[in-house]
Amino acid sequence: MKRSVNAWAVGADYGFEETFAKVKAAGFEAIELNLDADGAHALTMETTAADLQKIVEISKKFELPVSGISTSIGGNIGSADEAERQAAVDVVKKQLFLAKHLGASAILAVPGAGNTPWGEAHEICIEAYRSLTPVIEDTGILVGMEHVWNGFFLSPRDLAYTVDEIGSDFVGVYFDIANCADRSKSEDWITFLGERIKRVHIKNFNRKSVFEFAFPLLFEEGTIDWVPVMAALRKIGYEGPLTAEFGAPEGDPSENLIKSADAIRRIQCL
């Protein structure tokens, strides 16, 4: 399992070259980039193949591969509104384009429902991804659907059902260790989802009470028990990157990056 980090940890004031340099110097082995709004190191819907070639050269310079393409504009692929749904499909297609040109092997997808009822939205999402399957499989890029706090995936069973109904080896789960830790054990989700898990976001969580929680950095105090989490990942045969995901601080992000990379090293040894 390689140490990776999402570029959001660096901050939009830094260009791609500075971002790659800081991530490499901190001890990470890969970086996850983002399809996002405009920013110094954001990929956008307007990013071209020529733009991506420049990033490829930076990646080679620092010997830091791109592990995946995340996004903050995932859209509502489960929406009954055709225009809203098509916008979400376009995001997935753009992520696949970006990943292919950057040599990344996976993208992160965040299905949403908009104002569509939950059950109907899941079936619409499944049909949308079935339609996308030929495009996905043609690129050879893995698509991992992530459970975020938008009310779409409420349990590992919801994720498993959706992935299984889509029925492609290239569509699975992008598992976020912290996003399910408010009410359940991350290791239970890992065990249930098994080989459906294609990629992992490694994030900390601190559940102080039923109504009080926080997302501390990996090197800060949290309530996730990393021993069973790592045991569960090994049991299902996961060998992909562990991608840290956290926001950039004010000022230089180097200290947080270094401490986070060190924290992943310690977690890897558990």
What are these regions (language model features)?
Residues 30-34, 130-223:
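Acidic/histidine-rich catalytic cores of soluble enzymes
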Residues 229, 238-253, 257:
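Long hydrophobic alpha-helical segments typical of transmembrane helices together
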Residues 41, 117, 210, 252:
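Glycine/Thr-rich phosphate-binding loops of Rossmann-like dinucleotide-binding domains
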Residues 223-235:
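A short, acidic, amphipathic alpha-helical segment used as a generic capping/interface helix at domain edges
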Residues 6-10, 34-38, 71-74, 112, ...:
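Active-site beta-loop-alpha junctions enriched in small/polar residues
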Residues 17-18, 53, 57-65, 75-172, ...:
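Active-site acidic/histidine proton-transfer and metal-coordination neighborhood
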Residues 3-7, 31-33, 66-71, 107-109, ...:
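Hydrophobic faces of well-ordered beta-strands that scaffold small-molecule active sites
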Residues 1-101, 130, 168, 195, ...:
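N-terminal pre-domain/capping segments
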